[in-house]
Structure formats: C-alpha cells, structure tokens
C-alpha cells in the first residue's frame, strides 16, 4: 500500500509549486487542474516541443502565445518556464470564462476554442453547455487523462 502511494507521488510531482500557486491565485484557476494539464501536456519538461509546434511546460502554440501576450500587454517568452506557466494558466482562466464546464475548457485547451464552440453549436453539448460527446478522439483521450490526473492530484495533496 505504501509503495503504491509513493509511486503516485513520484508520478504526480508538484514541480514549479511556487510559480503555479502564484499564477493560479492571480488568475483564479484551481492549481491541481494546472498540475494535471502540465503533467499531461509535457510531463513537467520545460523543453518539450510537440510535432505541431506547441512549446514548453503547458505546450502553448506560438499563435496562442501571441494572443495571450497582446491581451495581457506583456512580453513573455514561451521558452521560459515561468512565462510559459503564466501564459498557460491565464489561458485556462480565459477559457473558464468562455465555457461553463471543465471538460469544455480542457477540450478547448487541446483542440482550440473555435473548434469547441463549433461542437457546441452543432449539438455536441447539453442544455447547460456541458459536452455530451467529443468528436476528436485525441481530444476525448486528452480530457479523460487530464481529469484522471486532476482527481489524483486532489486526492494526493
């Protein structure tokens, strides 16, 4: 039993804790959700770059980073871990204001805001805006994975 618990602590670290706590509080985002996104996106590898060009801990696309920097009025660098976290946490906060449900927020983080808005318009959401189906298999798996890690972080810490 103890070995299993230790395994989860090793698999679900709280790296960058000070920075994640600070920006999560600033932008009103659940820190455990941020850890789950970072764990899923990059496994806490600051130098991660996806085949599609997403960069850093939170795997932010350069075009999204540009939008975030313009909106915040700040000059931030995707390759600097603290800046990447600031952008990603702000972006989650932005998506939380657009969508009422965490699954929709996560789907938009993964597939894009416009894509999820299209799904909602095309009947993939219930009356309260919750996604009833996610047409992209990759995004469906992503949302499940982040939710799994999110629940694990909530239980462990």
Predicted regions and their residues:
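N-terminal Sec-pathway targeting helices
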Residues: 1-3
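Catalytic glycan-binding domains that act on GlcNAc-containing polysaccharides
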Residues: 6-157
């Amino acid at each position: 039993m103890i070995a299993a618990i230790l395994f989860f602590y090793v698999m679900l670290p709280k790296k960058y804790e000070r920075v994640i706590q600070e920006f999560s509080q600033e932008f009103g985002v659940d820190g455990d959700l941020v850890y789950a996104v970072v764990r899923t996106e990059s496994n806490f590898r600051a130098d991660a770059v996806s085949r599609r060009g997403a960069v850093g801990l939170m795997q932010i696309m350069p075009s999204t980073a540009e939008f975030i920097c313009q909106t915040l009025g700040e000059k931030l660098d995707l390759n600097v871990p603290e800046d990447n976290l600031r952008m990603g946490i702000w972006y989650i906060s932005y998506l939380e204001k657009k969508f009422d449900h965490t699954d929709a927020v996560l789907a938009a983080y993964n597939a894009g805001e416009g894509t999820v808005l299209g799904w909602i318009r095309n009947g993939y959401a219930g009356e309260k805006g919750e996604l009833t189906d996610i047409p992209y298999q990759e995004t469906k798996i992503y949302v499940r994975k982040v939710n799994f890690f999110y629940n694990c972080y909530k239980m462990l810490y």
